[in-house]
Amino acid sequence: MFKKFDEKENVSNCIQLKTSVIKGIKNQLIDQFPVIEPWLNQIMPKKDPVKIVRCHEHIEILTVNGELLFFRQREGIFYPTLRLLHKYPFILPHQQVDKGAIKFVLSGANIMCPGLTSPGAKLYPAAVDTVVAIMAEGKQHALCVGVMKMSADDIEKVNKGIGIENIHYLNDGLWHMKTYK
């Protein structure tokens, strides 16, 4: 999604949101990530301006005080940015890939089933279309945000094909876009 993303070329405009819209977004975030509720006022303080940065390909990035927090495509579900995920690692369930998959994930490749079932990888129970944080063997922070394309049970049984779709990874265009004022 952000492989060829460039802040100067892809950002079209930035809009400050009304409080009623912010409430709706907060409720949507709580529905989507229930564990975030106690931390939401810390992540999105009431007095701070919340803005939506509109980009090409119908991508919207939610910012507070210039800090990029969440993004979505075509009014779909919200995904946390990796910067937010590094501050609050508990908001998404984790899956762990082995050391051999790290360089491929960091180049934007989807996570294949063998990278989740080999020694060094850890596959936790998760349903299809669950947003997950991809951790790496021996590393502390998440290296990508992805969406489960198969359930954890199916990944273990089939062990072929794409298991998790890579949505946002370290060093992609969104990662390089540190803040937006």
Swiss-Prot record:
Protein localization: Cytoplasm
Short name of any one Pfam family annotated for the protein: PUA
Keyword terms: Cell cycle, Cytoplasm, Growth regulation, Transcription, Transcription regulation
Domain of life of the native organism: Eukaryota
Transmembrane segments: none
GO molecular function, one term: RNA binding
Gene3D superfamilies named in the record: 3.10.400.20
Start and end residues of each PUA domain: 92-171
Coiled-coil region(s): none
Keyword Transcription regulation: yes
Example GO BP: formation of translation preinitiation complex
GO CC terms in record: cytoplasm
Family recorded in the similarity comment: Belongs to the MCTS1 family.
Protein purpose: Plays a role as translation enhancer and involved in cell cycle regulation.
PANTHER family with a match to the protein in the record: MALIGNANT T-CELL-AMPLIFIED SEQUENCE 1, MCT-1 PROTEIN
Record remark: domains: The PUA RNA-binding domain is critical for cap binding, but not sufficient for translation enhancer function.
Record's protein name: Malignant T-cell-amplified sequence 1
